[in-house]
Amino acid sequence: MIYINNIEVMRGTNVLLSEASATIFPQKRVGLIGKNGCGKSTLFAILKNKLSLEQGSVTIPKNWLISSIEQETPGLEQTALDYIIDGDTRYRDLCKQLEDAEHSNDGNLLASIHEQLEHAGAYTIKSRAEALLFGLGFSKEEINQPTKNFSGGWRMRLNLAKALICPSDLLLLDEPTNHLDLDTVIWLEGWLKRYTGTLIIISHDRDFLDNICTHIIQIENKKLNSYTGNYSSFEKERAQRMALEQALFEKQQNQLNHMR
């Protein structure tokens, strides 16, 4: 469970969020929407503990692993496949521990690390990384090419795959469909529907939000407004809410006019 309680967020002298609260339940797929500059990416930074609050609190379970899309992809000699596998930091850490343990001649330690590697899916990580790359449109030949060979759009696909391969409890995706063709978007939708953690997506692609989201959080008037359902459900509920507010306002105005 993620609790966002009465937070205030500023960018310079500009207040982005004020007394804003929301609760996000585990295993939900949430679309985070709002006008450009309203604070969506800033909220992601807060969830990743990279930005402090003026007031309020954000509570995320301490044992949760968080994965997100990196914004930069350096041009490296490292192959695309190897770059993606780096996304599973637990696997890479265990490999380093195994390498160190092999010099210690400690049989118990080696057995423990091998057991942890098996639990971490070490024996399927290459096939899982390949499946992600193929799903995102890379060919069998391309996955073994250096990352420096790819254009900016394809490097963003690499970063997306790197975020997906990371075992996570909370997955934060900022505009994941940018640079993707329709077939790849459909593949990504299928993958995300099978994801068992909590998912929060920033996207301007309404069809994508419709197909993926179980909930919507809208940033409006510096508040976090929560809705159950996909984007289309949000639009209907918001329209109904605005109509009720308008009717109430008109009723109040009529009452004031009669009192004059």
Regions found by a protein language model. Give the residues of each.
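ABC ATP-binding cassette signature C-motif
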Residues: 1-251
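Short cytosolic helices in intracellular loops of multi-pass membrane proteins
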Residues: 250-260
